[in-house]
């Protein structure tokens, strides 16, 4: 019962998270181990709104730093520095074309929350824009799409536009002008299909 509940969070609103969780598999092998995990998490004080996101990011740090397809997790302090240098505004449309765990998008959402919370939650329309029309992330790894959408949800952005897309492909080379701010650590390692790669970045 637990895993179907987790998979279906946000399903009634057709959120990004619920979309990417449809095909997820539950890999905790026994009920006893799940009980132990739940008990450990239950002991963590959750009064601070940032705690869930902080725990999640800590667990992400335990994942191998390099995965398949050239995935690298950008260190948190580097992400934070880049976001602070770029100073995103509530009017920005922010994109990470190789989002992975959505670290840049999370940091941008935290920056906006810290500096513009009155503006972004001034009315239902502004809050909806923040949740649904501000953050765009693309990746072609289904696990990363799940992790990224869950990371955003745990940090208060319930329905970002996180989609399955190869940003380097010719098919998506026309979208650059759609965004006012692009934050990214491009996939420098891994294989690249030169045939499908956009001409302007070959």
Where are each of the predicted segments found?
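Tryptophan-centered motif/residue detector
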Residues: 1, 190-193
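Non-catalytic, mostly N-terminal accessory regions of nucleic-acid modification and defense proteins
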Residues: 1-90, 161-170
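Conserved S-adenosyl-L-methionine
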Residues: 71-184, 189-191
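A mobile, often basic/glycine-rich helix-loop segment
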Residues: 193-202
């Amino acid at each position: 019962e637990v895993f179907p509940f987790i998979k279906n969070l946000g399903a009634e609103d057709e959120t990004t998270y619920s979309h990417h969780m449809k095909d997820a598999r539950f890999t905790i092998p026994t009920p006893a181990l799940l009980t132990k995990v739940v008990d450990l998490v239950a002991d963590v004080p959750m009064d601070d709104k940032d705690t869930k996101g902080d725990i999640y990011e800590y667990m992400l740090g335990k994942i191998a730093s390099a995965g398949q397809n050239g995935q690298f997790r950008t260190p948190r302090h580097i992400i934070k520095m880049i976001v602070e240098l770029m100073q995103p505004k509530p009017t920005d449309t922010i994109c990470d074309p190789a989002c992975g765990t959505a670290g840049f998008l999370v940091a941008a959402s935290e920056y906006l929350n810290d500096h513009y919370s009155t503006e972004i939650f001034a009315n239902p329309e502004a809050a909806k824009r923040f949740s649904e029309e501000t953050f765009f992330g693309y990746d072609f790894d289904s696990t990363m799409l799940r992790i990224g959408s869950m990371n955003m949800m745990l940090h208060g952005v319930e329905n970002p536009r996180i989609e399955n897309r190869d940003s380097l492909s010719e098919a998506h080379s026309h979208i650059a002008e759609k965004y006012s701010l692009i934050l990214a650590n491009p996939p420098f390692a891994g294989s690249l299909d030169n045939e499908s790669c956009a001409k302007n970045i070959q």
